């Protein structure tokens, strides 16, 4: 079902069916979007429940000014960033680096089934600053256009291109050291 059909269902009073279609169409994509930042299967599942709860609560205010997928990704991204900020505060209270904790989670994650190179890339991306990590993940993994990322993040296309380039150069430099 297309996003336009989902919106039409919602507007026709079939809110529950429309929401179920959103969950069906976007669960996996949003899961992997969140997982790239959270690095834990269990935390991602918990966060996804919160995200879909926020989506359900916010759907009546969706005005169609943005594409549905961009609106959903924006909610998911904002909730994920809020979660990471809370984790960072908790980590600082425990005198431990959030980056180090995320790297440890990647190493210990029983659900990670990638190669060693993928594990190293995931860890390197986790060390990028928040904005660069978001832009790189959406562009590289989700293969989104800069215009769509701009709609999700509320950032200009030029700034996104610069962030992506800087992230790419940092990752390239890190992997050149390994070769």
What is the predicted function of each stretch?
Residues 32, 46-53, 66-78:
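Structural recognition of an alpha-helix C-terminal capping motif at a helix-to-coil junction
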Residues 135-139:
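A short pre-motif secondary-structure segment
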Residues 9-10, 92, 96, 120-123, ...:
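C-terminal edge and immediately downstream basic/flexible tail or linker adjoining helix-turn-helix-like DNA-binding
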Residues 61-63, 74-95:
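Arg/Lys-rich amphipathic alpha helix in sigma70-family domain 2
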Residues 1-29, 36, 126, 148, ...:
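N-terminal module of bacterial RNA polymerase sigma factors
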Residues 3-4, 90-115:
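Internal acidic/polar
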Residues 26, 163-166:
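Residues within the DNA-recognition helix of helix-turn-helix
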Residues 11-12, 36-39, 50-67, 87:
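Sigma70-family region 2
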